[in-house]
Amino acid sequence: MSSPNTETLTQMIEEISQKLNMLNVGVIKAEDFSDEKIEDLTYLHRMVMKKESFSPSEMQAIAQELASLRK
């Protein structure tokens, strides 16, 4: 059974991936992030969900931030 934090992480990652139209969504999984990073991921999620569109450099920066938050 998954924890509420894992479910929250999964939902946020899926929403970020959809918003950014990431083609390789399977590469980013909730299991790759520790519960300790949920606050940082929540901040990133809020920022992504507020914007309508992203420049290529913004998308790259977001992808790099996601990578830095991984375990």
UniProtKB/Swiss-Prot annotation:
Q: Name one Pfam family in it.
A: DUF1128
Cysteine pairs forming cystine bridges in this chain are none
Keywords (A to Z) from UniProt: Phosphoprotein
Matching InterPro entries, A to Z?
Answer: UPF0435
Where in this protein does the record say Phosphoserine is found?
Answer: 57
Q: What domain of life does the native source organism fall in? A: Bacteria
Q: Which family does it belong to?
A: Belongs to the UPF0435 family.
Specify the protein name.
UPF0435 protein YfkK
